[in-house]
Amino acid sequence: MSVVNQSFVQDVDAVLSAQWNVGTNTKADAAAGIATIGDDGDLRFLLTRVAVSGQGVLGSAAVDIPDGDYALRVDEVAFPVGAIAHRHTHTGSGWRHLVNGDLRIEAEHDTTVMHAGDSWFEPAGSPVRAVALQTSGVTRFVRCMVIPANFVGVSTFQLHDPADAALPRLQMTHRHFDHLVQVDAG
């Protein structure tokens, strides 16, 4: 799976492509853009059989595609000032792209501060904690994951420590779509 911007012009054989276009919303309570299946957006997520590289590629990594049916999910996560996504995992692997603000990502083996325009990959089942660093406005990222079909319409978010469920959860997730891909048995 790869995340690319508008300067990516290669002809690739994508299994599936999702696009996200910047909108006008700047508040945390609604999506900041519009996502659809397609390949002509401000930001694109390409599910390909081989890694892509070159101009416009913001990141590319191998993604485990579940056996049988699966879905491509595109959503946005908005962090108002003070928001923390406590250590958690997701059922699906995928790319994130920071649209606004600064976000500290505390992964299993390192900590990185992401700035608007940065992209990062999170493998399925890999614990991560995210802390919004801005003092005003909203920090927001767009995410595209490959998820098992049984998670269509269901959150993939799983707290790593159940005790964290008692902590405040200020971030808001805005799901654009789950696009089901049915695998032909023959």
Where are these regions (language model features)?
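Compact recognition or signaling/catalytic modules
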Residues: 89, 99-125, 129-159, 164-186
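Short, conserved beta-strand element in jelly-roll/cupin
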Residues: 14-32, 90-105, 141-148
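Conserved hydrophobic/aromatic beta-strand scaffold that supports enzyme active sites
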Residues: 43-45, 74-76, 95, 119-121, ...
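Ligand-binding loop in jelly-roll beta-barrel domains
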Residues: 28-57, 124-152
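Surface-exposed interaction/gating patches
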Residues: 62-110, 184-185
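A short, N-terminal "cap"/entry segment at the start of jelly-roll beta-barrel domains
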Residues: 1-15, 33-70, 159-186
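Short acidic-glycine-tyrosine-enriched beta hairpin
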Residues: 9-43, 67, 79, 107-128
